[in-house]
């Protein structure tokens, strides 16, 4: 059997960096080189301050960096030396042309394929790590076949990642499954078994699933679509709970105890974010439309529509509760990452909520423990989010949560950071304008509602009526509409 001794990973982002760091950590006899065209990112991987935050990542990197784990911008040499090349580059949603807003843009995948074939000789395994549409491996293989050389043998596999940001290291060390797809030919199966051997040193063999390439590619899209669907489903129930007096947490517990349903991903919130869910569901929608399956496409589109609705509904609730206007009012936004234990802001609900409130003239004071100021400014300065001077006029980045809440009309919790449960809310209430509102978009304060009401807060949360003496207001009856799907037409201001 072919033995993999050297691995090259093209792409040092949220997938490539942690994945290959764990492989190097678990397989010290394999030399792992992570390469990227972004020199500043590679410099960060080689520094004490890593470019991404992930619990446990720093310890893993430091245990093997400089020994059998290397980060470099020398892409060509790393490809030439490798037995296995992971393609772990971005596959963003297209922002222009056919499939705009839904189809995956595979330009980086294609560029990798061309660079790999240019720098390869002999036998090499090329593996998709990036989330790609079905039959992307076929496109890679066609590029290889069109640029073949004597004695060149490139085998293409699919090995999608199933890690979740915030628990990536745990997921990589103890995965639910490892999925490897390859050609159903002797050469293809030889490559599959070689990659299986890499994982078998720490992953039980029964957790390593082998399929054909197309099943592997579709399984990744389907997995993310099912998870997103669960969140949209419970969020739809949260709207019903708010209208009837039910508590969505109690409903979720009741249905989650049914073993046929299970209790995971039944946490109602202001909406899902991150780099994968929306992108992959929209990719699935586009695939269904391209295959003339309009009913299937509409079914999955509703998952995205419900997520957008949940965000608009939450923003409308903030505005309505504050006497139908937030113009010139200070609003504290606690949390900007799309979930706790990560600094990733891609498709974060905080961006959308901030957009709605800025459009109404609110002054936002934003705090997040792991998202840099520059990233928040870039996200909110996107042409699809704000006008040229909106961010400079309406947004302040605070150094701590108390500064953000000082003098605020309302506190809006958008990320479920554990630290928000431990804040001194009496101190916060004293410094806020009265009536003081808390809008808990992540249900992180569920156990504190009585205490917070005793302090004097008006509490609004997802999927539950809390405040017994709610301040009367005149509802606008209007839920704002907004999309980040429009293509950028200018560079964001920092």
UniProtKB/Swiss-Prot annotation:
Top-level taxon: Eukaryota
Modified residues (Phosphoserine): 476
Allosteric switch region: annotated span: 129-135
SMART domains from the UniProt entry: UDPG_MGDP_dh_C
GO cellular component term, pick one: nucleus
Binding, NAD(+): 11-16, 36, 41, 89-93, 130-132, 165, 276-279, 346
Residue ranges, annotated region (Important for formation of active hexamer structure): 321-325
EC number annotated for this UniProt entry: 1.1.1.22
GO biological process: chondroitin sulfate proteoglycan biosynthetic process; gastrulation with mouth forming second; heparan sulfate proteoglycan biosynthetic process; neuron development; protein hexamerization; UDP-glucuronate biosynthetic process
Name of the top EC class for this enzyme: oxidoreductase
Active-site residue numbers: 161, 220, 276
NCBIfam families in the record: NDP-sugDHase (TIGR03026)
Recorded family membership: Belongs to the UDP-glucose/GDP-mannose dehydrogenase family.
Quaternary structure (record): Homohexamer.
Record function comment: Catalyzes the formation of UDP-alpha-D-glucuronate, a constituent of complex glycosaminoglycans. Required for the biosynthesis of chondroitin sulfate and heparan sulfate. Required for embryonic development via its role in the biosynthesis of glycosaminoglycans. Required for proper brain and neuronal development.
PANTHER family noted in UniProt: UDP-GLUCOSE 6-DEHYDROGENASE, UDP-GLUCOSE DEHYDROGENASE/UDP-MANNAC DEHYDROGENASE
Protein name: UDP-glucose 6-dehydrogenase
Organism: Pongo abelii
